[in-house]
Regions:
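Short acidic-glycine-tyrosine-enriched beta hairpin
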Residues: 75-91
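Tight coil/turn sites that cap or link beta-strands
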Residues: 46-48, 83, 91, 101
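Glycine- and acidic-residue-biased ligand/ion/polar-headgroup-sensing regions
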Residues: 59-69, 74
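A short hydrophobic beta-strand segment most commonly corresponding to one strand
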Residues: 87, 101-118
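A short, N-terminal "cap"/entry segment at the start of jelly-roll beta-barrel domains
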Residues: 1-37, 121-134
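Conserved GNAT-family N-acetyltransferase fold
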Residues: 43, 62, 86
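Conserved short histidine dyad/triad with adjacent acidic residue
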Residues: 26-29, 41-56
């Protein structure tokens, strides 16, 4: 079992296809660390990049450590910068948008584990999260 996971060592999954999609890196999950409580990963978004509005039955903590983001949770937009955590309750619509001029770097932690398998299925199919009608 791994106890230390560094960026670049995790499983990289391309959501939306490799050419025009966005990479998500899975760093901590049951398969590699034996965790039973959560999955943790990271992603970078270029200026203007976004994660579409979606929901899932998992609690999620987003932690921005570089850049500026608009994270919308349950219809309420929150402008956040470095060193900011955002909690997303289960089954609540949310999205992420890089509103800064630099790359947005963030981590996500989902509890319980399992959403890493959704990421794998989306990547295998060349899809991103399904878009939600406005």
């Amino acid at each position: 079992m791994n106890h230390v996971s560094r960026r670049g060592d995790g499983e990289i999954l391309w959501l939306g296809g490799h050419e025009h999609g966005r990479p998500v890196e899975i760093l901590v999950e049951p398969r590699t660390t034996g965790t039973r409580a959560f999955t943790m990963g990271a992603q970078n978004l270029p200026p203007g990049g976004h994660v579409p509005t979606h929901r899932h039955p998992y609690e999620e903590i987003l932690f921005v450590y570089q850049g500026r983001a608009r994270i919308t949770v349950d219809g309420v937009p929150h402008e956040v910068g470095p060193e900011t955590a955002v909690f997303v309750p289960p089954d609540v619509y949310h999205s992420i948008e890089n509103v800064g001029e630099a790359e947005l770097r963030l981590t996500f932690t989902l509890s319980p584990p399992g959403y890493e398998n959704v990421f794998r299925e989306l990547a295998r199919a060349g899809n991103d999260h399904p878009r939600v009608p406005a």
